[in-house]
């Protein structure tokens, strides 16, 4: 019971359900691109990509709640941060730790690619996609002068969220070195439009 009380607020902060669901997007992208279950180094890299996406989303979701804490004190006082179940200091550590984990899984995937038959060049699109997602995160959440502040700008913010959701399947295809696969891009477009219509 005590363990549940400790973990439940973190699961809520990280939106663990949505974040874990993203794993299926990565797996789907890799299966569509390779026309079957990936094997060998590709299978290992796909798993690492899944973990990278999951922890990236943990970080983004936690950052979103951290940035909205004052609003949530009024509108959603039951959430982990405004309720005090998780302190702001602990939340910052969680955001940083999960971001580092996401990058670490990516680095391990790069090492496996470089050390094996795939080669680093075949894996580099994965890094580009991860960086695009990071740029979207910065421009969505940050209030910096360098940011487009898309979160509060309506349509651009919706585009950023829909793009980040769609990128998951492209990231999966990149895990098997085929990020330009036509089947994957068809699913990406459908997913992007569906999510955009919901936003």
Indicate residue ranges for each PLM-predicted region.
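Membrane-embedded alpha-helical segments that form the functional core of polytopic membrane enzymes
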Residues: 23-67, 102, 107, 123-138, ...
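Hydrophobic alpha-helical transmembrane segments in multi-pass integral membrane proteins
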Residues: 166-178
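Interhelical loop and helix-boundary elements at the membrane-water interface
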Residues: 1-23, 76-96, 139-164
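Short helix-coil transition/hinge motifs at the ends and kinks of transmembrane helices
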Residues: 36-41, 110-124, 143-151, 177-183
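Alpha-helical membrane-embedding segments
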Residues: 82-83, 104-117, 163-169, 185-195
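Juxtamembrane/interfacial segments around transmembrane helices
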Residues: 99-109, 153-162, 176-187
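Multi-pass membrane catalytic core of lipid/isoprenoid biosynthesis enzymes
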Residues: 69, 73-130
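Membrane-water interface of alpha-helical transmembrane segments
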Residues: 5, 9-12, 43, 88-92, ...
């Amino acid at each position: 019971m005590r363990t549940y009380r400790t973990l439940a607020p973190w699961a809520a902060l990280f939106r663990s359900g949505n974040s874990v669901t993203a794993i299926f997007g990565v797996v789907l992208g890799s299966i569509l691109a390779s026309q079957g279950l990936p094997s060998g180094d590709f299978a290992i890299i796909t798993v690492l990509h899944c973990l990278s996406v999951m922890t990236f989303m943990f970080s983004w979701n936690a950052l979103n709640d951290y940035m909205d804490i004052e609003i949530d004190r009024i509108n959603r006082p039951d959430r982990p941060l405004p309720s005090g179940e998780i302190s702001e200091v602990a939340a910052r550590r969680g955001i940083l730790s999960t971001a580092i984990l996401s990058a670490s899984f990516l680095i391990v995937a790069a090492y496996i690619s470089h050390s094996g038959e795939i080669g680093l060049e075949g894996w580099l699109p994965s890094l580009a996609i991860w960086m695009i997602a990071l740029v979207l995160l910065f421009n969505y959440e940050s209030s910096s002068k360098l940011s487009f502040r898309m979160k509060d700008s309506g349509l651009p913010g919706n585009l950023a969220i829909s793009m980040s959701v769609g990128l998951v399947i492209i990231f999966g295809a990149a895990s098997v070195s085929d990020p330009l696969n036509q089947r994957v891009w068809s699913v990406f477009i459908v997913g992007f439009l569906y999510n955009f219509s919901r936003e």
